[in-house]
C-alpha cells in the first residue's frame, strides 16, 4: 500500500483553475519530484499538501489514514496544527528568523508545540510544579534533538551563529533541521536549487540523497530537469494544472 496517496486534487483561485485533478502516490522512503515550468501549479500543489491552503476537491491519504477529504467538515484549529506537523515544508526563501540564532531557529517550532502539550497536561489537574517539571523535560528532549540534527547536517559549529553569518547552503540546512525537528512523515522542498550555482546545487543533491538514506520520504518541487533526475525515485510533470507525464526514475 502506498504511503501517500493523493486523489483528484482540484484548486481554483479567483477565476483560474490552478489544479485540475492531480492524482499520484508515493512509497515510504522515496523521493517524488514534481517538475514543471513557472505557473504550472507546482507551488499551489505543495501548499495544499502542507495545508497552507486547502483543495476544493479531492482526498489526501497518509500512512493508511485519510488526512483530508473535501467532502468532510472543515478542519478545526487543533486538527490543522496536527496536519502541519505531518508534512514539513522547506521554503524556497528559507524563512529563518534573523534575530534568532541557528539553535533557536531550529527549536522555536518545537517549543511552541511543547507549550501546547503543557496546556493539555495542565487540564489533567496537574500542579504548577508538575507542569514546570514536564516542560523542562520536553525542553531538554527538544534541545538534545536540535543538537543531534545540527550535527547530522554539518552545522554543530554554527549553533550560536545568526542567519546573516551563514552561506545560502547553510541557511537551507537550518531550514531543513527546523522542519525535521517536528518529525514530519513527509518533507517537502519548494524549489531548493532556485538561483543556486552548480557547486551549491551539487551540495543540495548530496544532502537530499543523505536524507533518503535515513528513510525520509520527500516531495521536491522544481523546474530544473537535470536536478530532478539526480534525486528522484519518481517524477511527475505538471503543465497547466494537470499531470502530463509520470514515471519512475
PLM regions with names:
Residues 222-223:
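H-loop/switch region of ABC-family ATPase nucleotide-binding domains
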Residues 50:
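Helix-to-loop junction immediately C-terminal to a conserved catalytic motif
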Residues 181-185:
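A short, proline-enriched helix->beta-strand linker immediately N-terminal to the Walker B motif
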Residues 198-200:
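Helix N-cap at the start of a conserved alpha-helix in ABC-type nucleotide-binding domains
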Residues 228-230:
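A short, surface-exposed alpha-helical micro-motif characterized by mixed small hydrophobic
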Residues 187-190:
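Catalytic Walker B motif of ABC-type/P-loop ATPase nucleotide-binding domains
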Amino acid at each position: 500500500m502506498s504511503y501517500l496517496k493523493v486523489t483528484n486534487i482540484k484548486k481554483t483561485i479567483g477565476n483560474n483553475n490552478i489544479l485540475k485533478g492531480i492524482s499520484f502516490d508515493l512509497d515510504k522512503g522515496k523521493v517524488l519530484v514534481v517538475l514543471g515550468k513557472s505557473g504550472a501549479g507546482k507551488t499551489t500543489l505543495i501548499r495544499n499538501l502542507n495545508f497552507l491552503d486547502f483543495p476544493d476537491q479531492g482526498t489526501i491519504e497518509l500512512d493508511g489514514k485519510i488526512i483530508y477529504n473535501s467532502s468532510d467538515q472543515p478542519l478545526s484549529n487543533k486538527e490543522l496544527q496536527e496536519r502541519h506537523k505531518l508534512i514539513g515544508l522547506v521554503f524556497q526563501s528559507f524563512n529563518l528568523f534573523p534575530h534568532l540564532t541557528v539553535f533557536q531557529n531550529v527549536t522555536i517550532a518545537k517549543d511552541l508545540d511543547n507549550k501546547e502539550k503543557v496546556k493539555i497536561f495542565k487540564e489533567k489537574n496537574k500542579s504548577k510544579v508538575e507542569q514546570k517539571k514536564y516542560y523542562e523535560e520536553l525542553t531538554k528532549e527538544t534541545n538534545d534533538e536540535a543538537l543531534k540534527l545540527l550535527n547530522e547536517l554539518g552545522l554543530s559549529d554554527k549553533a550560536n551563529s545568526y542567519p546573516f553569518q551563514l552561506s545560502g547552503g547553510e541557511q537551507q540546512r537550518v531550514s531543513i533541521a527546523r522542519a525535521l525537528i517536528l518529525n514530519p512523515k513527509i518533507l517537502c522542498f519548494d524549489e531548493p536549487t532556485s538561483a543556486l550555482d552548480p557547486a551549491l546545487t551539487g551540495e543540495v543533491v548530496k544532502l537530499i540523497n543523505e536524507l533518503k538514506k535515513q528513510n525520509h520520504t520527500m516531495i521536491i518541487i522544481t523546474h530544473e530537469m537535470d536536478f530532478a533526475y539526480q534525486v528522484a525515485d519518481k517524477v511527475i510533470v505538471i503543465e497547466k494544472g494537470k499531470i502530463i507525464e509520470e514515471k519512475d526514475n
